[in-house]
Each structure stands twice: as structure tokens, then as C-alpha cells.
Amino acid sequence: MGWMHTARFLTTAAQLHHLPAIEVPEIAFVGRSNAGKSTCINTLTQQRQLAFASKKPGRTQHINLFALGKQGATDAVLADLPGYGYAAVSRSDKLRWQQVMLSYLVSRESLTAIVLLCDPRLGLTELDEALLNAVRPRVEAGLKFLVLLTKADKLTRAEQAKALSITRLQAGGGEVRMFSALKKQGVDEVAQLLWQWAHPVQKEDAAVEALPPSKDQN
């Protein structure tokens, strides 16, 4: 989808309070280090180096924001959060960043949707499930949520079907999709879903569309 291809760097922040206030829908990408988060963002936006992928997983420790929409008319923002759970960083750094991400996911007012990336060969980890539990109140209040099973090309079709079934049970509802940057599996579908989330049909508009045509229109 062309809308995703308009993505451009907006800002980066090491602390939550350094992030600017955003008045458009914000979609956060989160996941365990090495789940393919940066690759996913770069594939969706068709930009090889938009999201930085460190050669040492767990070393990217900033929240990066990317604007979407025409220049001067941003209509959504992507947030790339640091990967979590990798042993290469110190315990104190891991705990600090887990707290920063938790605060972001629970309190960020402009947050409209969360995309949780997961390696289907590993399934949802304890940290993934802890994240799900932390944001569940917001999801129940209307926050959109997608579990994206990356690296789908590593699985057979039967294995993909099994992974989808198991993850849907673990996630307790919500969207679950397979994704492969290599095979471009799920790319268009995910891009379309994110666009819909960033451009919700207002109830008033939906009601007008649902009305039968008037006699003057017949």
C-alpha cells in the first residue's frame, strides 16, 4: 500500500517524557529482540534502512517515531520500540527498558494500536504474555491489537496453521496474522489493516452510508 511507503523519520527518544505529543493515531511495533521487528517495518514501508536493525539484538534502546502521510499532512505515526528479552544487555538495562515500554504502552495517549511481533517457532514468551496482560485493559477499552507471527517462510503450511491456532488461544482474541518479509506473505493485508486502524470510519459516516437512498435519489 502506497500510504505505508510515505514513512519518514520523525524523532527518537531515550526517555518517554522526551517524546513529542502526537495528535494523530500512533501505532506501536513491539516484540522480543530478534523477532524481526525492524525487518517488518522496513518491508511494510519498502525502505531498507528506515528502522535500524542492530547487529547485536537488544542494543537498540530508543523509541523511534516515523511519520506517515503526505509531507506537511501527517495522518499517523509508527513507533518502533526497543526489542526486549535479549541476554546481551545488562539486567539493569533490560529492567529499565521494560519499564519505559510498559509506561509507554499503558499511558501514551495517542497510542491507537499495538503490533506485537513474535517468532512462531518460539510462540508467545513469558514477556510477550506479560505485555498482553499489561495492555489488556486498554485493548478492552478499544485499543487495536495485532499479533504478527514473523518469519512464516520458516514453517510449512501445516505448521503455520497450528501456530495461528495456538497463538489465537494464547492472545485471547484479537487479530493474529502470519508474516514473511522474504516471501512478502501478509504484507499487503497488514498494510491495509494498519491503514484502516489509522483511518477509522466515524459512526456518523457509517450511519449515513447505511441509510437507504431517499426518494429523490431513486
From Swiss-Prot:
Q: Which PROSITE patterns does the entry link to?
A: G_ENGB
Q: Which residues form the EngB-type G domain?
A: 23-200
User: Required co-factor?
Assistant: Mg(2+)
Binding-site residues, Mg(2+): 38, 60
Where GTP is bound, by residue?
31-38, 58-62, 80-83, 150-153, 179-181
> Where in this chain does the entry annotate a coiled-coil region?
none
A cellular component term from Gene Ontology for this protein is:
cytosol
CDD domains noted in UniProt: YihA_EngB
Pfam families to which the protein is assigned, alphabetical: MMR_HSR1
Name the UniProt key words of this record, in alphabetical order. Cell cycle, Cell division, GTP-binding, Magnesium, Metal-binding, Nucleotide-binding, Septation
Question: Per the record's keyword annotation, is Zinc included, yes or no?
Answer: no
The source's domain of life comes to Bacteria
> How far does the signal peptide extend, from start to end residue?
none
Which is an annotated GO molecular function term of this record? GTP binding
Which Gene Ontology BP terms does the record give?
A: division septum assembly
Q: What does this protein do?
A: Necessary for normal cell division and for the maintenance of normal septation.
User: What is the similarity comment for this entry?
Assistant: Belongs to the TRAFAC class TrmE-Era-EngA-EngB-Septin-like GTPase superfamily. EngB GTPase family.
Q: What is this protein called?
A: Probable GTP-binding protein EngB
